[in-house]
């Protein structure tokens, strides 16, 4: 029974988050703006670049996989790649330039002004994510941070 209580508590927490989003026009507008940025990127022939650390790396890879795969409907694949996927490249850059540069260095190499960078993060404090967002800003590459935000 104790496990069921824990499960219900987690479900209630998720419901509270969804209710906050439903009731907050500001959050809804940020979601809409993100969708518009992604649509414009694809319309212009850009690609969606994603990255994250730990579990967020898995989210990054999953998102990019769904963009290249089917998601819900058969369609032309949307150009997308996860910067978290290549262990050889991550360790090469980490060794040569420092772990904080593992994503920004890749963006410098492949990013264009048509692209969008999605940073999956729970804390919004990881140095490598911050560095990547700074490179995007300085290179006029649009970016969307996902997660780790205060919903109020």
Segments (PLM) and residue ranges:
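Residue-level recognition of alpha-helical structural elements
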Residues: 3, 26-30, 56, 137
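Generic N-terminal amphipathic, Lys/Arg-enriched alpha-helix
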Residues: 1-26
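Hydrophobic beta-strand scaffold residues
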Residues: 48-49, 143
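Glycine-rich phosphate-binding loops that contact phosphosugars or nucleotide phosphates
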Residues: 56, 61-152
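A short, well-structured juxtamembrane/interface segment
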Residues: 23-44
């Amino acid at each position: 029974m104790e496990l069921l209580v824990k499960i219900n508590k987690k479900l209630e927490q998720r419901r509270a988050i969804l209710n906050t989003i439903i009731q907050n026009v500001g959050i809804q507008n940020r979601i809409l703006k993100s969708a518009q940025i992604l649509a414009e990127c694809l319309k212009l022939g850009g690609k969606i670049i994603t990255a994250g650390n730990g579990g967020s790396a898995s989210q990054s890879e999953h998102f990019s996989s769904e963009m290249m795969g089917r998601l819900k409907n058969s369609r032309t694949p949307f150009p997308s790649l996860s910067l978290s996927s290549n262990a050889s490249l991550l360790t090469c850059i980490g060794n040569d330039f420092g772990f904080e540069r593992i994503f920004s260095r890749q963006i410098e190499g492949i990013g264009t002004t048509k692209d969008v960078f999605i940073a999956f993060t729970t804390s919004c404090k990881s140095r490598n994510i911050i560095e990547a967002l700074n490179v995007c800003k300085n290179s006029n590459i649009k970016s969307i941070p996902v997660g780790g935000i205060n919903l109020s």
